[in-house]
């Protein structure tokens, strides 16, 4: 606190300091202190732009994905829209163009959807960004992964960012949505073909001991059998991640599942 006070008083002119305050019943609360080059992007502006381009999340192609493939009423319990005093995440899946996955479970086909998610922080804890994911309707898992032509977009909060963030984000989303389903099916089939000889050792190289145990338990619960292949491991990882409360931590784990598909 002393260092912060000294820096604010000595290192910068008061005109260069941006302060974000939130008014409440108990008075004003300091949410963020930023420098002159910082360009704040409001969460409300992002959600408004997404609604304008992609719909309201319940009626367009990109929607809050329904549980187990059913069109359900979006509630606080099943929503894929998250916000806190630090950051925001919006997950939307292309519900109208689902991908049929052969032999998803017990010889039965399943469905997946391509989706995208946007994250932002009004207080400067992270960049504004977008990445793509696959939504598995069998178990409501998310795999943070996309086709090769889609790259994750990260935009720093600078003074000019409000004028350009949407122009960089929208083409990536449209490219992913308009891509063929064959690349998704092939990636899954390739991952299924790679067998894991020692699952415990394989997971231990990537996760802690407790996480590895939880991943194996999640796959056993969801699929009714132990992990045997790279695809099984990805499914177990996302099953474990599904129970992580904070979205930034959950996404970090879901990215690991996507890395397995890339490695297949």
Task: State what each model feature region is.
Residues 1-49, 53:
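Feature for intrinsically disordered/low-complexity regulatory segments and propeptides
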